[in-house]
Design a protein with these regions (language model features):
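Active-site adenylate/phosphate-handling loop in enzymes that bind or generate adenylated species
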Residues: 125-130, 161, 166-173, 227, ...
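A conserved beta-strand->alpha-helix junction
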Residues: 221-250, 337
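Flexible, polar/low-complexity N-terminal or interdomain linker segments that lie immediately upstream
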Residues: 110-112, 362-411
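Rhodanese-like catalytic fold shared by cysteine-dependent sulfurtransferases
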Residues: 406-437, 444-476
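Short amphipathic alpha-helix with an adjacent loop that forms part of the alpha/beta core around
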Residues: 94-98, 246, 391-394, 425-434
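RNA-binding accessory domains that recognize and position tRNA/RNA substrates
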Residues: 1-177, 187-232, 382-385, 442-444
Length: 476
């Protein structure tokens, strides 16, 4: 009689002292249990000599275990009891004689406990017993590699080792707050600190609610459902639209991108203090955009009391994209960065004194206010509650507002559209007709989404669309 089960292996946990290792093993087991319980799977768990054994035959574990941090590899195995080496040989031959017919094989053995034989003895004895059923032995590139692990009076047979994500168990290394945009960089940065065992919550500053909020939540759901196993991560959503309005009306546009980032850091600092986070995480890398030069990163971080962790600091964009794809984090959705709402010619080298003279004009609590706090388990419900204002081409009594540059407007615009910049939006709203449907469009859709969200807050029927999507509607 045998038991169907899974063998879990770890690497770094085994390097810890006895107390830390025991704690991390227990956290890892609890994380696995919490995910299995979602599917009504309640198996028995055992620990022994650097292994965790899960007694279940559920194929769901093939999907779940590769996403749980702390697991180096795992195998679906069968457990047998034995008294003599002859019993091991008999059971192994009965299991694999048919499987290796016409194929080359190899045997890899490991042993723990007090026995009259060594691991090499087992490999030789089993190899000799199986040889006549096979096409021969190939130790380097066998068609089938038979693994046997012997622990005291039990042994385990399996034919594959499946890689896990490695790292440390989630919740074993403190708690961090990720500045999360939902683009390419922030999910990867968040994944990397989660892999190191840090339970990580997300902070998102919405500039065009609900549009950019929905896009962010889709990226957050993809990340958290896959990898935040054992931890129900929080998501803080704050409204930064007042800041966009203030900055778009500001006479000096050189510092606007950096002002935004500095204020976001200050709000994150406030949450770190309020909820006991050990630091904040960003997806910044040196020189990627104007606000991420070493000089500007220093300015943004200056005076912040909590550590700022930047896992991608040395990555280029292609490396980040490739990493994102390898972890199934890459989402092929069109989303512009916040900087497209601000300066077209941002400052690359910023004067320290001038910057602080500018930042004094902006109080973070005046311009960033919390919209909502949700968690991983309520993302779907919150998305359903948000009314999406994307224009789909089926409206009467429509007025189009072009938010692109004057030169782009002259080259092409929707017939009858008026050309406007965000700094003129407040005045436009004061004189708008409440019986019309207003459709804003811009290059990528974020400026227009922001304008539509502001106008909707004033009680108007306002929608947004990107230039590309609007042109596509015309062709159809």
């Amino acid at each position: 009689m045998c038991n169907q089960m899974f063998i879990i292996r770890y690497s770094e946990i085994g390097l810890k002292g006895e107390k830390s290792r025991r704690q991390m093993e227990n956290i890892l087991i609890q994380n696995i249990k919490s995910e299995l319980e979602r599917y009504n799977i309640f198996p028995e768990f055992k620990k022994s000599d650097g292994r965790i054994y899960i007694f279940t035959d559920s194929k769901l574990l093939y999907d779940i275990l590769p996403r749980i941090f702390g697991i180096k590899s795992f195998s679906h195995a069968e457990e047998f009891k034995f008294r003599t080496i002859e019993e091991i040989v008999s059971i192994t031959v009965s299991k694999f004689s048919g499987m290796i017919s016409g194929k080359k094989f190899a045997v890899s053995a490991k042993r723990s406990g007090s026995h009259s034989f060594t691991s090499m003895d087992i490999e030789k004895i089993l190899g000799d017993a199986l040889y006549k059923y096979s096409a021969g032995v190939d130790l380097e590139h066998p068609d089938i590699r038979i693994y046997i692990e012997i622990r005291d009076n039990r042994f385990y047979l399996f034919t594959e080792k499946i890689e896990g994500p490695g790292g440390l168990p989630l919740k074993s290394e403190g708690k961090l707050l990720s500045l999360f945009s939902g683009g390419i960089d922030s999910p990867v940065a968040t994944y990397m600190v989660m892999k190191r065992g840090s339970a990580t919550d997300l902070l998102f500053c919405s500039l065009a609610h609900p549009v950019d909020t929905v896009q962010m939540l889709m990226a957050a759901k993809n990340l958290l459902d896959k990898y935040s196993i054992g931890y129900n991560a929080k998501i803080f959503i704050i409204d930064g639209s007042k800041l966009v309005t203030a900055i778009s009306e500001h006479p000096d546009q050189m510092y606007t991108n950096i002002i935004f980032k500095k204020l976001l850091y200050e709000y994150a600092e406030y949450l770190c203090e309020k909820y006991g986070y050990n630091g904040m995480v960003t997806g910044e890398s040196i020189g990627q955009v104007s606000s991420q030069t070493p000089q500007n990163l220093m300015l943004i971080s200056e005076g912040i009391k909590y550590p700022v962790y930047r896992p991608l600091i040395g990555f280029d964009k292609e490396e980040t994209i490739n990493y994102s794809k390898s972890k199934s984090l890459f989402m092929n959705q069109s989303s512009a960065e916040f900087c497209s709402l601000f300066s077209k010619n941002p400052g690359i080298i910023v004067n320290h004194k001038d910057f602080y003279n500018e930042i004094k004009k902006f109080n973070v609590k005046d311009y960033m206010q919390e919209l909502v706090e949700i968690d991983k388990n309520t993302i779907d419900d919150y998305i359903k509650s948000i009314k999406n204002k994307r224009f789909r081409g089926e409206l009467d009594n429509v007025e189009f507002i072009d938010l692109r540059s004057g030169s782009d407007y002259e080259n092409w615009h929707e017939p009858g559209a008026i050309n406007l910049n965000l700094g003129e939006l407040r005045n436009f709203i004061e004189h708008a007709d409440r019986f019309k449907n207003y459709v804003f469009y811009c290059k990528k859709g974020l400026n227009s989404a922001y304008a539509a969200s502001i106008m909707s807050k004033h009680g108007f029927n306002a929608y947004y669309v990107s230039e590309r999507d609007l042109k596509s509607m015309q062709k159809n």
